[in-house]
């Protein structure tokens, strides 16, 4: 006697879903799930923070330097941060490298603390808004460093905060400050980037590396080419760092961008200055009828705001 086995339901067939043939379904899932989640949580728009995953809080970086002074050893850097192994360097060189790294970590920790403070100020302000939807929610890539600092500051202010994490073989794990219901894990970078761009009304770029540059220039390009059907405020934080990394004036001089394009960027060096830029711009462009110094108005009734709760996709990108 034979037993008939029912075939696996297609949507429960894990090998198929993880196969090349199932890729389109995986991509679609990374589009539909965040959309459903943001509707359920009544998220209208966001302010996105970009920056290095490698910066630590000031107290943590200071303890590491103190430990190095006391014992000659500090918390080792992740493998992807280490440019050489002990086999490549002599003992004295290794010790000096560790000290240089520890001192740099303390110096760069100011950006962690500044991102934390800015996120706090922004969230504290948005929580005064009388709205059925959450406005200008602090959003990060969900990992450590500047991402953690942004989520941490927003959480400390008592607000919701979003983490759009990416699954990587190293470095990236969701930080503990993300609102649990707003922590999303992505496999595809391009879908994660879509959600950074889709709801954001402003971008704050802290010092960072390849990933930060990639994310910043993609959104800068979308803004320059007017592919975003909305006003996007871009704040570049830490002029000393960025002036060493970028020479945008050279692009103008060589004719590869227009001088007018430089106006897309606003530079700031303190959390208070960055917050002032964001508050003025967000109020002017996205809170109709509200003066920068006034209290928050009743729920805005513009078409984009109304469509954000409908089944249709709101027209924030062309």
Regions found by a protein language model. Give the residues of each.
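Glycine-rich beta-alpha loop segments
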Residues: 3-8, 14-164
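Alpha-helical scaffold segments in soluble metabolic enzymes
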Residues: 27, 117, 121, 149, ...
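Solvent-exposed alpha-helices and their adjacent loops that cap or buttress functional pockets
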Residues: 39-42, 129-133, 155, 175-178, ...
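Short, solvent-exposed amphipathic alpha-helical segments in soluble enzyme
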Residues: 64-67, 155-156, 218-223, 250-253, ...
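Residue-level recognition of the N-termini of beta-strands and the immediately preceding loop/turn
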Residues: 134-137, 230-233, 262-265
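Phosphate/pyrophosphate-binding betaalpha-module
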Residues: 139-206, 210, 217
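Short, acidic/small-residue loops that bind anionic groups at enzyme active sites
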Residues: 158-171, 206-207, 220-244, 259-260
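C-terminal functional extensions of proteins
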Residues: 236-318
